[in-house]
Curated annotation (Swiss-Prot):
It is an enzyme of class 7 (translocase). The complex is composed of two ATP-binding proteins (PhnC), two transmembrane proteins (PhnE) and a solute-binding protein (PhnD). It is found in: Cell inner membrane. It catalyses: phosphonate(out) + ATP + H2O = phosphonate(in) + ADP + phosphate + H(+). The lineage of its organism: Bacteria, Pseudomonadati, Pseudomonadota, Alphaproteobacteria, Hyphomicrobiales. The gene is phnC1. Its EC number is 7.3.2.2. Residues 2-246 form the ABC transporter domain. This is Phosphonates import ATP-binding protein PhnC 1. ATP binds at G35, P36, S37, G38, A39, G40, K41, S42. Pfam families: ABC_tran (PF00005). Keywords: ATP-binding, Cell inner membrane, Cell membrane, Membrane, Nucleotide-binding, Phosphonate transport, Translocase, Transport. The keyword Translocase applies. It is a peripheral membrane protein. Belongs to the ABC transporter superfamily. Phosphonates importer (TC 3.A.1.9.1) family. It comes from Rhodopseudomonas palustris (strain BisB18).
Length: 272
């Protein structure tokens, strides 16, 4: 479904953010991307849809190689890719409904976009999505009146209304409290399964990654150092990803209780 081959990114200052990353993601497969700060996780996600231009390598979505597309063709192909951001990227003065419908702008003509006129089927799908993410009672509320967890749910609904084939998710829980983080991750993974969506989730919390993401890819200094099941994150593997002292702090978690936590604790104890 998605194939990344020998992808590199070197910035003008000579810093190599990605060093020959190769990765395949199947239809409906959800993977977690973990690693220390500066490992290249966000760069990798942004290179997939060319928000950042890679220096070399290939990114292929289905039968289409994204790295070779013109700007016009790239805009069309980006409709197949939903993006969920850490900072939410909502339009503060617009309502929840209007922010969700913004995900359909790529399918709407200029004047309809200008006057925010959307097809009835888009409106009905937005309502259904807001019902699913638990925000139907906030449909007319402005985005700047929402909590962090609610804002992230709007971002999820906006990405899904595109009806994408792939989701790129960049630190969806970084600004959220532990309980809300688990709720958002559960919702995100459930929606991917329900819609058979492939997803790459850049996540800083190893405990959350283990609890909700069956396959983990570990990056260190722009290199893939681990690609395997969450259950394979042993102390040795985590050290190769984070370093001798850093992984225990990253994996410490929030200490809360929720579905799946006994499994998380067992994994962490086994790793130690």
């Amino acid at each position: 479904m998605l194939r990344i081959q020998a992808l590199t990114k070197t910035y003008k200052n000579g810093e190599a953010a990605l060093r020959g990353v190769s990765l395949s993601v199947g239809a409906g497969e959800i993977i977690g991307l973990i690693g220390p700060s500066g490992a290249g996780k966000s760069t990798l996600i942004r290179c997939v849809n060319r928000l950042i231009e890679p220096s070399s390598g290939r990114v292929q979505l289905g039968e289409v190689e994204l790295t070779g597309l013109s700007s016009g063709a790239l805009r069309r192909e980006r409709r197949r890719i939903g993006m969920i951001f850490q900072e939410y990227a909502l339009i503060e003065r617009l309502t929840v409904m209007e922010n969700v419908l913004a995900g359909r702008l790529g399918y709407t003509g200029f004047w309809n976009s200008w006057f925010r006129r959307f097809a009835e089927q888009d409106i009905q799908r937005a309502i259904a999505l807001l019902e699913r993410v638990g925000l139907i009672d906030h449909i007319d509320k402005r985005a700047d009146a929402l909590s962090g967890g609610q804002r992230q749910r709007v971002g999820i609904a906006r990405a899904l209304i595109q009806q994408p084939e792939l989701l790129l998710v960049d630190e969806p829980t970084a600004s959220l409290d532990p309980k809300t983080s688990r709720s958002v991750m559960r919702l995100l993974t459930e929606l991917c399964i329900e819609n058979r969506l492939a997803a790459i989730v850049n996540i800083h919390d190893v405990v959350l990654a283990q609890a909700f993401l069956p396959r983990i890819v570990g990056l260190n200094a722009g290199i893939v150092v681990y690609d395997g099941p969450a259950s394979g994150l042993t102390a040795e593997v985590l050290t190769s990803i984070y370093g001798e002292e850093d992984w225990t702090r990253t994996a410490a978690g929030d200490g809360g209780t929720d579905d799946g936590e006994p499994l998380i604790i067992a994994r962490m104890e086994a790793a130690q």
